Amino acid sequence: MQNTTVLYVPIGRKTFDIEVAEIYRQKSMEWLKGNCSTVIAPEQIVTSVEELQGFLDSIKGNKIDTVLYQSVTFADGEFMVKILEYFKQPVIVWSVREPSVGGRLRLNSLTGGNSTSNVLRNHQHPFAFVFGNPDEKALQERLLRQINVMRVLKALNELKIGVVGDYPPGFFFSAANEEELKSALGVTLHKMDLQEAFKECVKLPEQEWIGEVERAEKQVIGLNRNDETVTKFAQFSTYIKKHIQSEELDALAMRCWPDFFNDLGAAPCSTLSQFTEDGMVTSCESDIHGSISMFILRELAGGNAPYLGDLVHIDEEKNSVVFWHCGAGAYSLANPSTGATAGVHPNRKIGFAMDFGLKAGEVTIFRVSHTPDGYRLLVMKGNALDVEQPFTGTSVEVELATNASDTLYELMHAGYEPHFALVYGDVTEHLIELGRMLNLETKVYV
């Protein structure tokens, strides 16, 4: 069941076989109710623009994620134009098969879908097309994937990222042009003062921040609650959470070094890890596009916690690469043989950070990338291997679906940013479709 709100609008004309069309509508509605949390729909096929307007007036104010326009029979472009007067969400156009071949063309649904797609293209409105009957598995899978992508498109358009401090010196890839970001992806930014957070968080009374320690103890192995760095982790996390709530933030991009070590006296990795584990994806080094990449992966993968790492090693014999970071990783990503183990930052030797290898499984690797020419997407696939922890900190060895050496050279020559987001599960098809919907160049390695 997808947690999404779909506006289902079955359209037809009475000059076609409306009785057969109604059977299609009933089966479609039954399937939608079984797979989407909320479905808003008329009680029968809408057969005139006047009838459609009456229905649309009756549902004004409803918040939806997707418009599902089913051309149950042929209908002209007036219907879609009327819907666009009321709703600006992306549209899925659905055509069904003819019930029989030979004699009268009973529905002409495919031409109706063709006509509607033409209207949407000429209105420069984002849309997708699906074809098939509601009981066909291939149609169901495609439609679910499409509905999920549409939901993420809407979530992106509402995404508000808290940027906690500027990016470290020389980390130019972490920045974003706010106007271009809003125009291309719909994302907005909220700037926060890191030094102010350091100053104020240590003033918080224990009863306010102790809950963060107790939360960490539920999953982190070897956590010493008496360690001063654990206290500072909890204080800082609590302070930031207040701003997350007051500003209604959906994700974070946080400056980490050198400030955390020099000014707070604690590693940032624990805060990044716990926030991401609990659904507030947080990138390090104030990587705004890294945070967006993590957010998209979590949304498409059903809430699975994503990872963000550098590509640090390649093993040509195993056709594998290693993604690593110095101590950030959501707890649930840990290899079950070790669990999410507490440690110190591998270079600064300050706690508390995470220190574990990631679990095995199918993974999708992704990056929302930016160049002087604009935005592009990178989509890769592989399998995380069940191996010993490659490097201190958090790391994962991934056997790629494509030739690792060739892929490495292509990534470098294309100048991708050195942070790659990763999530467990295969959402490559979703990402490719997302790129099409956003009209972005999408490079695929699957």
Swiss-Prot record:
What's in the GO CC field?
Answer: cytoplasm
Look up the EC number in the record and give it. 5.3.1.31
Any one GO BP annotation for this protein:
fucose metabolic process
Instruction: Enumerate the PANTHER family for this protein.
Output: FUCOSE ISOMERASE, L-FUCOSE ISOMERASE C-TERMINAL DOMAIN-CONTAINING PROTEIN
- What job does the chain carry out? Part of the sulfo-TAL (or sulfo-SFT) pathway, a D-sulfoquinovose degradation pathway that produces sulfolactate (SL). Catalyzes the isomerization of sulfoquinovose (SQ) to 6-deoxy-6-sulfo-D-fructose (SF).
Query: Could you tell me one molecular function GO term of this UniProt entry?
Result: L-fucose isomerase activity
The record's section on SUPFAM superfamilies has:
FucI/AraA C-terminal domain-like, FucI/AraA N-terminal and middle domains
Instruction: Describe how expression is induced or repressed.
Output: Induced by growth on sulfoquinovose.
Question: What name has this protein been given in UniProt?
Answer: Sulfoquinovose isomerase
| The organism of origin for this protein | Priestia aryabhattai (Bacillus aryabhattai)
> What are the UniProt keywords, alphabetically?
Carbohydrate metabolism, Isomerase
Q: Record's family? A: Belongs to the SqvD family.
InterPro entries cross-referenced by the UniProt entry: Fuc/Ara_isomerase_C, Fuc_isomerase_C, Fucose_isomerase_N/cen_sf
Q: What is the lineage of its organism?
A: Bacteria, Bacillati, Bacillota, Bacilli, Bacillales
Looking at the record's lineage, which domain of life comes first?
Bacteria
Is Isomerase a UniProt keyword of this protein?
yes
* Catalysed conversion reaction: 6-sulfo-beta-D-quinovose = 6-deoxy-6-sulfo-D-fructose
The first-level EC class reads isomerase
